[in-house]
C-alpha cells in the first residue's frame, strides 16, 4: 500500500496509489501526463482542510521548517494501518520529522517522488471534488502573499530595512566617489598639477574642470560660484605659471565626462545623506540624539534590525563592530576592546584618551535605554526629548571626568535643580562668635578636605603601583616567550643539521660499498 501526501493551499490531501511500487517505476511516473491517467492511478483517501488563511500560513511555515503540525499528525494517525505502508512526501526535512513520530510508515522522499508530486499538482482539481481550478489558484495566491509578508516581517512603523540599505549604499558611494576623485586628480594633474594642492574638495575640483576646461581659460572664467574670492585669485595666478603639459580636446572631453560623474555622485550622496537623516529621526529619534545619524544607522545595520539592537545589552552595544578584536583578545587572554562602532560618536571623540573607555560605557548604557524607548514604546511620538535628556547626563559625566564644562545640549533639556521650601526660623543669637573664639576654634572643614585629598592621592598611588606591576609581569612574560621561541628555533636548527649530517654519512657509506 502506498500513499502520497500533497500539501495544497486549501489543506492536506492524502492520496492512495493503485500501484504500491509506483515511486520505484520511472516509466509509470512518466505516463502520468493526462488528468485521466492521474485519476486512474490515484484516489483521494483523506483530506484535512485548513480552518483559515492564518492556519494555512502556520501549516506552510511548519512544512518549510520541517516540523509536523498537530493537524498533519492527526491525519497520518487516522490513516495508519496494521500493515506497513509507503508514504511519499515532497520535503526531505518533513520526511525525517514523520519518521521520528514512530508511525507505521516507510517515508520516501527522492527525485522520483518529486516528479510524482509535480504530476499530481498539475491535475489536482480533478482529484479533489468540490474544488475548482480558479478557487485553488486564488487560495494559492493569498497564501503566497501571506508567506511573503511573514518572511519580510514588514512593518509600516519600523521600516529599519530602509536605514540598513541606505547606510550600505552611502558607504559604497563614498568609496566610489573617492576612487573617481583620485583618478580625476591624477588625470587632470598632468595638465594643471597645482590645482589639486589648492582645492581639496572633490566636487569643487570637478566643477572647476567643467567650468574652466583647459588652464589657459582660467583668467577669463568666473569661478566665484564655486570658490571664495581669495582662492579664485590663487587658482588664476597658478594657472598662468603652471608646469603642466598640454592636453588635446579629446583628452579634455574624457576628463570632463569623469568630472560630471563625480558631480552627480556628490549631489546624490548629499541627497541620500539627508534621506538617511530624516529616516533615522522618524524611526529612532532618541538614538539619533545620543550618537548621531551615521553611527546610529551603522549600529542598526550591524545588528540586523532595530528590534535586535534594542534587545541587546549595553555591553554588546558598546563593542558592536569590534567582534574580531574581542574574540582575538579572549583567545590570547589579553584585554578586551573598550568600544566598536560607538567610538565614532561625537561624545566619545570629545573625551581624552584615558576617559574614552569610560564615556563609551556610559554612552552605550544610555543609548541602550533610548533604543528600547524608540523600539518598544507604543505611545511615543517622534520627539527626541528622552534622548536629549540622556545625552545631557552623559555630557555631565564627561564634564566631571574632564574637569571642565563640556555640555552642548540646550539648558531647557538639562535637569533643573529641585528648590526646597523650608520654614522660616528665628535668629539664634547664641550661635554668634567673637573673632578670638573663631581664631581659637579648630578648622574642621580644612582638615576634612586635607584628609580627602590624601585618600585620593593614596588611591591614585595604589592604582599606579598595580599598573606598574602588571606592566612588569607582561614584560617578563613576553621575554620568557621570546626565550622559549629562540630556544625552540635553535633546537630545530640543530636537529635539521644533525639529520643532514646523518644523511650525508649514509650516502658516503653507500658510495664506498658500491665502489668495493
Curated annotation (Swiss-Prot):
The gene is NOP58. Residues 283-403 form the Nop domain. Residues 429-444 have a biased composition (Low complexity). Keywords: Nucleus, Ribonucleoprotein, Ribosome biogenesis, rRNA processing. InterPro entries: Nop56/Nop58 (IPR045056), NOP58/56_N (IPR012974), Nop_C (IPR042239), Nop_dom (IPR002687), Nop_dom_sf (IPR036070), NOSIC (IPR012976). PROSITE patterns: NOP. GO terms for molecular function: snoRNA binding; snRNA binding. This is Nucleolar protein 58. PANTHER family: NUCLEOLAR PROTEIN 5 NUCLEOLAR PROTEIN NOP5 NOP58, NUCLEOLAR PROTEIN 58. One of its GO terms (cellular component) is box C/D methylation guide snoRNP complex.
Amino acid at each position: 500500500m502506498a500513499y502520497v501526501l500533497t500539501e495544497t493551499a486549501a489543506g492536506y490531501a492524502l492520496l492512495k496509489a493503485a500501484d504500491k511500487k509506483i515511486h520505484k517505476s520511472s516509466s509509470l511516473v512518466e505516463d502520468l501526463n493526462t488528468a485521466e491517467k492521474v485519476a486512474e492511478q490515484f484516489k483521494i483517501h483523506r483530506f484535512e482542510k485548513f480552518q483559515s488563511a492564518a492556519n494555512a500560513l502556520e501549516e506552510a511555515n511548519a512544512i518549510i521548517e520541517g516540523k509536523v503540525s498537530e493537524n498533519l499528525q492527526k491525519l497520518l494517525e487516522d490513516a495508519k494501518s496494521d500493515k506497513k505502508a509507503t508514504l511519499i512526501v515532497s520535503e526531505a526535512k518533513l520526511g525525517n520529522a514523520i519518521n521520528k513520530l514512530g508511525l507505521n510508515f516507510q517515508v520516501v522522499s527522492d527525485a522520483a517522488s518529486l516528479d510524482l508530486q509535480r504530476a499530481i499538482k498539475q491535475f489536482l482539481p480533478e482529484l479533489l471534488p468540490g474544488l475548482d481550478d480558479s478557487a485553488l489558484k486564488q487560495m494559492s495566491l493569498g497564501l503566497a502573499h501571506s508567506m511573503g509578508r511573514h518572511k519580510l516581517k514588514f512593518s509600516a512603523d519600523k521600516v529599519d530595512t530602509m536605514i540598513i540599505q541606505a547606510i550600505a549604499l552611502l558607504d559604497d558611494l563614498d568609496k566610489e566617489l573617492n576612487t573617481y576623485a583620485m583618478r580625476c586628480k591624477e588625470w587632470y594633474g598632468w595638465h594643471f598639477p597645482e590645482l589639486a594642492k589648492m582645492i581639496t574638495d572633490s566636487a569643487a575640483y570637478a566643477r572647476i574642470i567643467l567650468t574652466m576646461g583647459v588652464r589657459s581659460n582660467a583668467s577669463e572664467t568666473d569661478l566665484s560660484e564655486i570658490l571664495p574670492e581669495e582662492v579664485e585669485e590663487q587658482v588664476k595666478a597658478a594657472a598662468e605659471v603652471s608646469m603642466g603639459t598640454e592636453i588635446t580636446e579629446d583628452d579634455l572631453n574624457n576628463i570632463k565626462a569623469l568630472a560630471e560623474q563625480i558631480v552627480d555622485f556628490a549631489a546624490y550622496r548629499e541627497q541620500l545623506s539627508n534621506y538617511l537623516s530624516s529616516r533615522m529621526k522618524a524611526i529612532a529619534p532618541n538614538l539619533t540624539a545620543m550618537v548621531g545619524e551615521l553611527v546610529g544607522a551603522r549600529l542598526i545595520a550591524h545588528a540586523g534590525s532595530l528590534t535586535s539592537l534594542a534587545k541587546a545589552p549595553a555591553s554588546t552595544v558598546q563593542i558592536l563592530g569590534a567582534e574580531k578584536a574581542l574574540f582575538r583578545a579572549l583567545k590570547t587572554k589579553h584585554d578586551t576592546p573598550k568600544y566598536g562602532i560607538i567610538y565614532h560618536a561625537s561624545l566619545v571623540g570629545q573625551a581624552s584618551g584615558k576617559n574614552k573607555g569610560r564615556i563609551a560605557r556610559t554612552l552605550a548604557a544610555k543609548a541602550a535605554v533610548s533604543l528600547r524607548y524608540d523600539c518598544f514604546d507604543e505611545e511615543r511620538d517622534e520627539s527626541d526629548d528622552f534622548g536629549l535628556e540622556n545625552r545631557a547626563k552623559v555630557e555631565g559625566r564627561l564634564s566631571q571626568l574632564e574637569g571642565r564644562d563640556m555640555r552642548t545640549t540646550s539648558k531647557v533639556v538639562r535637569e533643573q535643580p529641585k528648590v526646597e521650601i523650608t520654614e522660616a526660623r528665628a535668629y539664634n543669637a547664641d550661635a554668634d562668635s567673637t573673632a578670638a573664639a573663631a581664631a581659637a576654634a579648630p578648622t574642621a572643614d580644612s582638615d576634612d578636605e586635607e584628609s580627602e585629598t590624601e585618600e585620593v592621592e593614596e588611591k591614585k598611588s595604589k592604582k599606579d603601583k598595580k599598573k606598574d606591576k602588571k606592566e612588569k609581569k607582561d614584560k617578563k612574560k613576553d621575554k620568557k616567550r621570546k626565550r622559549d621561541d629562540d630556544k625552540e628555533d635553535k633546537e630545530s636548527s640543530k636537529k635539521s643539521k644533525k639529520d643532514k649530517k646523518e644523511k650525508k654519512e649514509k650516502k658516503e657509506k653507500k658510495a664506498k660499498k658500491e665502489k668495493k
